[in-house]
Amino acid sequence: IIVDETDRLSALVNSVMELSKVSSGAEKLNPVDFDMSQLCFEVAGRYDAVCEQNGWTLQLEANKECMVRADPAMMERVLHNLLGNATHHMGADGVFVLRAIPMPNGGCRVEVEDHGPGIPPEELPHLFDRYYRARQDAGKTGTGLGLSITKAILQQHDFPFGVNSTVGKGSTFWFEMKAPQ
């Protein structure tokens, strides 16, 4: 129990420090041009073992080049936060989806979809708030900071983001990235 609680407290402290650095601007952006589809492919590959262990399926829909300008390390953190969130809200089918969709005017729309319980409309405005936990999250592990960190990173990049959700069907978290200049 002591080891578990120490790990939990350590994760919380690390999340608070990460959020503080990103929110304050202490962690500076290092934007470069890169293919977001390729980053999605690399990040999805890191979920192979956990998916196999749990009988889950991560569907990757990132078949077309999706050139963007952003900080790839920060975008990787966003992907891990959203995919981790999806694994906590996995539906009975065990499927979650990562999409990188080229936008007509350039750039890329990224979506992470789960087939879980969905989020009631009255909770949607609070999802990205610090420490906010949706009612169905009561008793689940986590710091309640992952979506706040995601929000801070996306705001620092000036990327629009949001969530679409239907109770009983699941949720899709999305953000839109700018094309290289």
What are these regions (language model features)?
Residues A86-T87:
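Short helix-loop "hinge" at the ATP-lid/N-box region of the Bergerat-fold HATPase_c
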Residues D158-F159:
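Conserved glycine-rich
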Residues I119-Y131:
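Short conserved segment of the HATPase_c
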Residues S24-L29, M67-A70:
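Conserved micro-motifs of the catalytic ATP-binding
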Residues N30-G45:
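A conserved beta-strand-to-alpha-helix junction within the catalytic ATP-binding
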Residues D4-L9:
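Short alpha-helical segment of the dimerization/phosphotransfer core of two-component systems
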Residues V50-Q59:
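Short conserved segments within the C-terminal catalytic ATPase subdomain
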